[in-house]
Amino acid sequence: MTSPSPLVGIIMGSDSDLPTMAAAIAVCEEFAVPTEVAIISAHRTPERMVEYAQTAHQRGLRIIIAGAGGAAHLPGMVAALTPLPVIGVPVQTKTLQGVDSLYSIVQMPGGIPVATVAIGNAKNAGLLAVQILASHNPVLLEKVQQYRQSLETMVLDKQAELERLGYRAYLDQQNQ
């Protein structure tokens, strides 16, 4: 049995980024979107990065999620080398808590956009990739709508519990 061709490439500059990027992988798995996952360093494996980005479209990918910390050149360089949408995930660093990564990814020159999520928020990167794919896939669109409905239900359930308990008891329950 052949597994479906990956639609989303999830790449990161280092294996230390994997704990962050795992959330994007999990979201794609939850929505049954096939992925490929790779460690590709813009600085340590530049030729590999170029080859990956330039062949992504021909290999069937539709979106690339790229996570990086520090100088965080991976998302922008990949975006410069591929016609596909690139979603950048700034990975939190010890020195500047990921602000350096965020600025590096979000400050792209005109014509080479990188959609950028919050520091460490690979889950939203995965959700954005799924939503982009859902714009041309009615089955996936239905799954996204169901997911959004589940978020609404969760908030309404919390509101009902807050009303039932009152704010003090609600906070006490959360702190246990």
Curated annotation (Swiss-Prot):
Substrate binds at residues 14, 17, 44. One of its GO terms (molecular function) is 5-(carboxyamino)imidazole ribonucleotide mutase activity. Pathway: Purine metabolism; IMP biosynthesis via de novo pathway; 5-amino-1-(5-phospho-D-ribosyl)imidazole-4-carboxylate from 5-amino-1-(5-phospho-D-ribosyl)imidazole (N5-CAIR route): step 2/2. Pfam families: AIRC. Signal peptide: none annotated. It catalyses: 5-carboxyamino-1-(5-phospho-D-ribosyl)imidazole + H(+) = 5-amino-1-(5-phospho-D-ribosyl)imidazole-4-carboxylate. It is an enzyme of class 5 (isomerase). Its EC number is 5.4.99.18. Keywords: Isomerase, Purine biosynthesis. GO terms for biological process: 'de novo' IMP biosynthetic process. Catalyzes the conversion of N5-carboxyaminoimidazole ribonucleotide (N5-CAIR) to 4-carboxy-5-aminoimidazole ribonucleotide (CAIR). NCBIfam families: purE (TIGR01162). HAMAP family: PurE_classI. Belongs to the AIR carboxylase family. Class I subfamily. PANTHER family: PHOSPHORIBOSYLAMINOIMIDAZOLE CARBOXYLASE (PTHR23046:SF2), PHOSPHORIBOSYLAMINOIMIDAZOLE CARBOXYLASE CATALYTIC SUBUNIT (PTHR23046). This is N5-carboxyaminoimidazole ribonucleotide mutase. It comes from Synechocystis sp. (strain ATCC 27184 / PCC 6803 / Kazusa). The lineage of its organism: Bacteria, Bacillati, Cyanobacteriota, Cyanophyceae, Synechococcales.
